[in-house]
Structure formats: structure tokens, C-alpha cells
Amino acid sequence: MKMQNLLNELKKENNFRELKRFKNDGKFVIFNDKRLLNFASNDYLGIASSGELEREFLNTYKNQSLSSSASRSLGGGGDEYFLFEEYLSSLYKNEALLFSSGFLLNYSCLSALATLKNTLFLADKKVHASIIDGIKHSNFKRFKHNDINDLEKLLQTNLSYEKIIIICESLYSMDADFAPLDKLLELKKKYKNIMLYVDEAHSIGSLGINGLGLGYLKDIDFLVLTFGKSIASMGAAMICSKEAKDFFINKARGLIYSTALPPINVAYSHFVFSKLANFDKLREHLQNLSSYLNELLKDKIKGVSYIKMIVLGDNEKANFYSAKLMQKGFFAPSIKTPTVAAKDTGIRLSINASMDFSDLDNFAKAFYEI
């Protein structure tokens, strides 16, 4: 089929994507000269939108390079990389390995693990596309979302595998709910050939002790941290054993063949991590905002965290609501297939700590007027 035919099909299905040109303005974005409250950003703590930490960092670290100019295997890794990895290792009591993005990390590490013979992946139905892309050419099965009984049935019928790697996200970015980590850890104790792979992309910085995530210091074999959301930087890190780190250094193609992160971003991520323990008030405010929006929208909304989903179940309806909200001063993009199942299409809302209660009052009023 020709490209244009495929694009025409997407348009018929109200599923055609276009890139929009915005200008960031704190908790707002400017689009077509209109100032919109931004519900699309993953800047959950408001660090990026405030700019305060960024200014403090730039005043202190003035001589960081803007380019690594090589992969880490070929000399693209100076002191900044090792210092940050050592810092993360001291926090998480395990080894740390930096990658250029969360997508690249998941794709590369899972593709590498897939080369291990007699290994099976069991992935939650709602895991991120980067995880699916990493395991799709391997032995894998999917279990019903957050359904421990369904997962255990799969385990019991596949115990002949030498290793079974269970994959989940600690906080799911579309369903806006949490993985049952404690129950998964119980399964790991029960079945000795299980390993756990947990993506903390949407929880790191904003949840857990000192914002260090929901899997912090738990018996998780592969813990994924990403820095482009609450950390307000870019890149990602794998927290794992020394053996696994050495394996990824040698087998994770996205690490071997990609230019390393810019040193200035590595240093900035390290700087933000060193401040996370100071952000308890921001995290508390974020949770209060989350609870307040649930009260305002009641049965119209799902999500127990700062990520919310207004499920509309139809691409056209989702686009309609998104456009109407934009007219009323809110940027809340529609989420459609294949990102979510057709029945789950709707409006995704990301709250951040730079918002206040009146922002949510205004949003709820606008939503009910549509």
C-alpha cells in the first residue's frame, strides 16, 4: 500500500497525527498566539516550567560540554557519566548504566535479554511501546493488566523456561494506575526462576521515599529510571546487578552504537537528583491537586495519581473535546489508537506541581460546559 493511502486511512479514522508548534511559558504553552494551561507535559514537579533549578545549575556549572561527540564505547564518556552512575549506585545499592533515552534503554536492554536462550518475557498488557518493541522478536506472552491471577496461570504453564522476566510499569502512563509491586515480589519469592523488570518512567522524582520511585530498594532485577519527566532533563538509567550491567555494555546495541548523552545533561540530571529529597512539599501539593481533580470530575475521570484519563471511547469525540478545551484555554490532547485500545480513547491530563487549585476549578468548569 502506498504511503498516501495509509495516511488517508488514518484521516478517515480520525487518527492522523500532526506536530504542533508551541512556545513554553511556565505552566502554559503559547499556540497560535493563545495562552493555554498545559495538561500535556510530564513535568510533574514543575521543575522545568519554573526554571529555578536550571538557573541555579547554570550559574554553578558553566563549563559543561554540549556534546559527547561519540558513543560511550568509543570515548564519549567523561567524568560526568561515571560520577552520576556512582551517585545512583550509592542511592539504589546496585549498579547504574546511563542511556540516551528511556525508549532506547527499554528497546536495547530487552532486545539484549532476548538473546539469552531459554528465556521467556511476561509483559503486562498496558506496558509502553518501547517495551513491546524490545520483546516482539523474542519468546513473550502478555498478561491481563495488573491481573496477578492471570499472570500466575501463565507462570505455571511455562515453568520449563530457565528464566522468566516479568515486565511492568510502576505507574502506567495511560491507565494512570499502579502496578501491584508487592504481589509481584511475592511471586518472585514463590518461583525461583523469575526476574522483575520495572519501568519507573512516570514515578521517579514524584513518588516513593525522597522521590526515588516505587521500586526503590526492593528486590527488582531491572529498574528503569528516566530523566525527561519529573527530573526535567533527558536520558535514562538502568539499575541492575554488576553482571547485568556488563552484559548490557557488551550487548545493548542502543548503548554501543548511539552517541552518548550531552555531558551538560548528565551533570544536570545528577544535580536534580541531588535535590530530590528537598521536594516533599512539591510532591504533597501534587498529590493534593490529584485528589482535588478527582473530586471535581468524579465519575468522568480515572486515575489515582497525577496522571488522569477522561475516557470517551471514540477518536472523533476525543478530538472534539480536545479542540473545545483548547478554545477555552487548555491544552489537553486526545489519546487515540494505537496508543490505547479503541474503547480507552479520550483525553489524558498530566497535572504538575506548578498548577494551583483554581487552575483545576477552571478546567472542570470548561469541561462541563462542552
Which functions belong to the PLM regions below?
Residues 109-129, 152:
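Conserved PLP-anchoring active-site segment centered on the Schiff-base-forming lysine
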Residues 55-102, 290:
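Conserved N-terminal alpha-helix of the aminotransferase class I/II PLP-enzyme fold
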Residues 284-329, 339, 351-353:
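Conserved PLP-binding catalytic core of the aspartate aminotransferase-like
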Residues 50-51, 55-59, 63, 86, ...:
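PLP-dependent enzyme catalytic core of the Aspartate aminotransferase-like
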Residues 2-5, 9-66, 162, 194:
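N-terminal "arm"/small-domain region of PLP-dependent enzymes with the aminotransferase-like
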Residues 216-247:
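Active-site PLP attachment segment
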Residues 260-279, 285, 289, 294:
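Structural motif of enzymes handling amino- and sulfur-group chemistry
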Residues 145-198:
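Active-site phosphate-binding strand-loop segment of PLP-dependent enzymes
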